[in-house]
Regions:
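HTH-adjacent hinge/linker in prokaryotic transcriptional regulators
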Residues: 2-60
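Short gly/ser/thr-rich secondary-structure transition/capping motifs
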Residues: 56-60, 103-109, 149-151
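Glycine-rich, small/polar surface segments that engage phosphate groups of diverse ligands
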Residues: 67-133
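Short, well-ordered beta-strand core segments
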Residues: 75, 123, 149, 167-168
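Surface-exposed amphipathic alpha-helices with a cationic face
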Residues: 139-143
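A short helix->loop->beta-strand "cap" motif at the edges of active sites that frequently abuts
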Residues: 144-148
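Glycine-rich, charge-decorated loop segments at or immediately adjacent to ligand/cofactor-binding or catalytic sites
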Residues: 157-169
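Conserved small/polar residues in nucleotide/adenosyl-binding loops
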Residues: 174-175
Length: 175
């Protein structure tokens, strides 16, 4: 018997298994969806989330946040995980249009950067939950040095909102 028999038994077992049921991958997207359908579902979900985000933030609030960005000497953007990637992407876009912006995703470097900030600087912290201790410590430190904090976070009340000078809310739609 030995190894060849084991390989044969495994291949027979795999061949005799019924097709596995479709499993959910993300919201309405299922593992057996054709690629085009998965793409269409993803576009629909993202569009709905963007409209919900637009509707939850007033025009006045958007203008106030734009004014904060324009008046900042330096914009320090941060986030953890996927929010850090959003911060990095937004920093690049701000730099392209002439803002002094930098994304700091390493939390030790973030605290050092914020401690060396001035009252004219702005911390733009991105966190859907707003509960990450590192981001809230950075926000506290920015306020201590006299700077401002702009949070992009979820609508549910959280610690980051309490520290922020201004908040923009984002909506994630899960079903």
């Amino acid at each position: 018997k030995g190894f060849p028999a084991l390989k044969l038994a495994l291949s027979e077992a795999l061949a005799s298994q019924p097709e596995s049921p479709s499993v959910p991958i993300h919201n309405q997207i299922r593992g057996d969806d054709p690629l085009r359908l998965a793409g269409e579902k993803l576009i629909k979900e993202n569009t709905a989330a963007m409209y919900a985000t637009l509707n939850v933030n007033s025009e006045e609030k958007l203008h106030e946040c734009v004014a904060m960005l324009r008046s900042a000497r330096r914009i320090i953007l941060t986030g953890i995980g996927a929010s850090g990637l959003v911060a990095q992407n937004f920093a690049w876009k701000l730099m392209k249009i002439g803002f002094n912006a930098a994304a700091v995703r390493d939390m030790h470097a973030l605290l050092a950067t914020v401690q060396a900030s001035s009252p004219d600087d702005l911390l733009l912290a991105i966190s859907y939950t707003g509960v990450r201790r590192e981001l809230n410590l950075a926000a506290d430190e920015m306020l201590r040095v006299g700077g401002k904090v702009l949070a992009i976070t979820g609508f549910t009340p959280n610690a980051l909102q309490q520290r922020a000078s201004h908040c923009l809310y984002t909506c994630l739609l899960y079903t």
